[in-house]
């Protein structure tokens, strides 16, 4: 299995659960030239009518300033890897089984395929687990 694996810094923030709220944040980022490769939303676990948005990458002073202007910040409680490569049947199983055999637990997983390529975003509770997963998937 040939995977390309890299760490990514995820940014996050709250979004009111109403039409256009996420689009307003994304508009500011688009005008700043931010080319997002990962965007994920979910309900806030403790606040009704609020959602959470997670996105990456954001880098450089201008992009960071734009993200902060819409109340986004680096996610400090999650470490994430992006795994990419040639897609085939069972790719999710291959990734998950290699991590399971090594005893690495995931916090979250998102896998998508377009054409013959896949991208998997693996979330971990801490940087040590992400480092262990990186080693498992690249050796």
Task: Indicate where each model-derived feature is located.
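A conserved regulatory-domain signal marking ACT and ACT-like small-molecule sensing domains
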Residues: 1-139
